[in-house]
Amino acid sequence: MGWPPAQKPEDSKEEHGGPAQTDVCATQVSEEFPGSCADEVLSSGSISFSGELQSYSHTSESPVETKTPTTSSEEQDEQSELSLLQKDENKLSEMWINHLKSKEIHSERSQPDRRLPPEIPKESAEELDALQSFCTKKVNLIHQRQDLRAKKSNRPKRLQLRWIAETSEVDAFNCTIPDELWNRIYLENTRATLAYIGAITQHISSQCPSCNSKRAELAQSDFLRRRKTLLQSLLLQEKIDEHLHTTDFLTRVGEAHQGFPRLSDDPRIIWKRLTEKMLKGSSGFGRAYSKQV
């Protein structure tokens, strides 16, 4: 099998719906749709190119499988034509992809991205609070209405019960009490008071054991207190007498003369003691003078 000599690659592309037709369709689509749909057009174009290549390869290979090749020169021509067609298709696909990319870039620059989420207004929190308060008020009103309806439905029963109670009280107050009943109640009250008075015993402190025990305790404590004060006074008097008798004038003179030398003592010892006392006295006087100064 061989391709006819008059046939060209461009003609075959036009017959099989090649890239020339897809280029025109793609330019029309890119002019009609915005830049945000460029990805979908690119994917559809690539799918159409792959489908055309597969269909073309199947159509070109099917006759080769059915018919045996005649000469090696025809096979070489077919392979060269196929390689040329593939190169042309690759070039066209690259051109189409670059064209779509440039269109997409221009559309992104000219138009803002529509897929971005809208900016939240500054007063959204206040609006939410207001909406929440409104909803709570409405819910409270609905609950209040339901409560009022329930109360209204329960009112007749309460009114009936009140009316029955009031009528029974009025009947009880308006009824007349017989005199026999009054007399009987009076007699019962007098008997109860007399029995209560008879049950009460008069308290006699001299005969009461608790009072007697308390009186004995008080007398004992008073006796102990008086005895203690008496003993303390006697002890104090004895101490005073001892002090007066032991510290009379003579005893004091004797205590003063205890430090004096005796007549039997050696005069050297006496002078030595006197000098020591004088030195002690002078040293004490000097210290006192230095402190005063």
UniProtKB/Swiss-Prot annotation:
Residues 1-23, 52-83 are annotated as: Disordered. Residues 52-71 have a biased composition (Polar residues). Pfam families: DUF4606 (PF15379). Coiled coil: none annotated. It comes from the Eukaryota. PANTHER family: CHROMOSOME 8 OPEN READING FRAME 48, EXPRESSED SEQUENCE AI429214. This is Uncharacterized protein C8orf48 homolog. It comes from Mus musculus (Mouse).
